[in-house]
């Protein structure tokens, strides 16, 4: 009886490691909850108090649910635990700062790039909000650039480039009421929850020691600028990637309805459509059917609600501008070389070479490169699909992320904060499945720094144009190289996960 009671007490005991992980996880989550309260109309101080109370109530339950394999890590891998603690605290602090700026834009000093006037005054969400307002008011051509010349508070209104169907999400927000700032906060909460939830869901689906290691690496990815800067800006790129990956996991789990609902909307960002090629090549006809069905449903819903004007404006005005390159022609103007320098687009390499004085670089060359790259990523999707049956879960999700990143690089303009998100997430998966030897630790550290390199425009000493080009292109090369390696490497299958779990390495032990 005594032995049984002692065993039961040991079974329910929560280790210090799990308490710390749970506490820091809630520290990352609580500021987002506080922003949600502000979006709903609560005062910031009240919202923060509610978030703190809720967080403290959740910590014990979360700590009990965390993997017991993490117990005693502070004794067996003290240095790794100390490094993890520093990164996790920094991630929580930086995330809290961004959340404060999202709740109250007057506190620019807490934003991700507080020193850069451009990032402090830029909001990608402003384009979605303005376009939704224009569509609901019945404007004939919501894509007319003259509609986006003003400001929303301190934020310069961005130009809207998306398909009309995308308006469904921001239009729901504007229909529910609230001003731009409250809807900006709500959009941040929605996208943060979606991205964070997708990251955790992938770790759980991969499972095993690799999944646990991936979960421990999440604070490092969350700390990276491609995540927090882009969440602050409100660009849909992150949500589109998260929705696409969740859709593919749903298809693998035999839930085509959910997967179709997610991917059917994500494809309105265009580049996730590459996964449709992958699904066709793997003969997942139910997944293809549900994706097409939901895309059609969203299209009908937007047409019925907002009318024909947005669609007609896109077909007759915006689509020709995109196809001809006119929509991005400003990138060829003199004086925009700093913008060209942060462009991670593959066709945008022509712009970089032109800015460096290389002759023969023209919009025609840029367009030719874009179509060659399009054919290349189509071929890579089919190549990956033909080997999908041999892949482990880790290899599958890594391949999906790599394909999404490569497809996104087809656009004429991919700012570094957008273009590096999928690769930094991919880095997490590669690191989680890698045996940690000194040379590999160095390589992973260099890759992490390169994939975190979002270059500011001002507010601090910056390298000259050639230096910016070199830094940006190095980061771009690491990102593209990582994605290509993941797609082209030979699949090891489920045995790879078992092999990684059996490796006598720090990474294995910390899993």
Predicted regions and their residues:
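Primarily membrane-embedded glycan-assembly and transfer machineries that use lipid-linked glycans
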Residues: 3, 15-258, 282-416, 500, ...
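Active-/binding-site microenvironments in catalytic and ligand-binding cores
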Residues: 10
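Aromatic-enriched
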Residues: 15, 35-41, 426-507, 511
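Hydrophobic transmembrane alpha-helices
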Residues: 58, 62, 266-272, 425
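A cytosolic-side transmembrane-helix exit/cap motif
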Residues: 259-260, 309-316, 418-422, 439-445, ...
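Transmembrane-embedded, aromatic-rich helix segments that form part
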Residues: 260-263, 271-282, 289-293, 420-422
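Short amphipathic alpha-helix initiation/capping segments at coil-to-helix junctions
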Residues: 395-399, 414-422, 432, 436-443
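Active-site proximal loops enriched in glycine and acidic residues that flank catalytic Cys/His/Asp
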Residues: 410, 423-425
